[in-house]
Regions:
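Accessory terminal regions of nucleic-acid processing enzymes
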Residues: 1-310
């Protein structure tokens, strides 16, 4: 691998722009369909767009702020010294592959990926497990670096520090590289988007692309009539299954009667009373319009409906 550019004096905008020039570690899981928070469809639109999006949230902020601490805990636990990479790296054999490494292991052909994890996601790391999109990220780093192994240290808030060592598996890396290069060659380069997979990320991206509507236009959907038929078939099946599910729940309730809880091997059932207060918005708008307007806001969205005309 080679150092593409130092990140020591690189602005956040330039850093993001360089990442558009190839596939990075955080792209890998999305391209493979393994990332629950990002899709290949989103990666595609990020790569072809000239817009630099500064996406950030509290979890990402904490991850950055605590990276030093996780690296320090890793050194304490393993005795391995680490150093900052301070660069965007590029695979010499596969120039499309780029990487930003959290840390490199001193004196070894190895690196370290630091993660911070909510305690609510601790089960995803239980019993030696590693989330699939993080495995893809680490394997991407192994592909770029040509190193022998990579460590991943995950700090689960309030619980523990989990450390795993992932060794190079040539078959896995070759498959990953092939998938990434296929994505770039057949999607990004010709600007042909991958087919949406039904993920929440795909929905967000599509809604962002087409947030406004033209009510003077009607699209001819005859070419995808088969998709509409398939959707209707699925809707009918879902409706039937929902009814069957509700019938089962009704039988369970009849069995429980006034019991708040029920048990069966492998199951815990609860049927408990709860109270909640809800604002009567219509009455508030009528009787206190000033207060209603003061605390109301306009939310713009496009409502999507399909009506089947038999």
């Amino acid at each position: 691998m080679k150092r593409l550019i130092s990140t020591l004096n690189l602005s956040k905008e330039d850093w993001l722009r360089y990442r558009k020039c190839g596939i990075t570690g955080t792209d890998a899981g999305a391209i493979l369909g393994l990332n629950p928070y990002r899709s290949a469809f989103q990666v595609y639109h990020d790569k072809i767009s000239d817009t630099i999006e500064h996406i950030d949230n509290e979890a990402m902020r904490q991850g950055r702020d605590l990276e030093d601490y996780v690296a320090q805990r890793f050194t304490e636990a393993t005795g391995l010294k680490v150093r900052r990479a301070n660069a965007i790296y590029q695979s010499e054999e596969h120039p499309l592959l780029l990487a930003d490494f959290d840390r490199l292991i001193v004196g070894q052909k190895a690196g370290l990926e630091c993660k911070t994890v909510s305690p609510f996601s601790a089960d995803k790391w239980a019993d030696g497990k590693i989330p699939a999109h993080y495995m893809a990220q680490v394997n991407h780093y192994l592909a770029v670096s040509g190193f022998d192994c990579w460590y991943i240290a995950a700090l689960i808030f309030g619980k523990e520090l989990v450390i795993h060592k992932i060794t190079t598996d040539k078959e896995v890396l070759n498959n990953l590289i092939a998938r990434e290069e296929h994505f770039w060659k057949y999607n990004v380069m010709p600007e042909i988007p991958p087919v949406p997979t039904g993920s929440e990320g795909d929905t967000q991206q599509i809604n962002q692309l087409y947030s406004a509507d033209d009510r003077n236009k009607t699209a001819d959907l005859n070419s995808i009539r088969d998709l509409l038929d398939k959707r209707q078939e699925l809707s009918d099946q879902i409706e039937q299954m929902e009814q069957e599910k509700m019938a089962i729940e009704q039988q369970v309730k009849l069995q429980m009667q006034d019991a708040a809880y029920g048990t069966a091997p492998g199951y815990k059932v609860s049927w408990v009373s709860s109270e909640s207060k809800r604002v009567d918005s219509q009455r508030l708008k009528k009787e206190q319009p000033d207060i209603f307007n003061r605390y109301s806001k306009n939310v713009r969205s496009r409502r999507f409906t399909i009506i089947h005309a038999a």
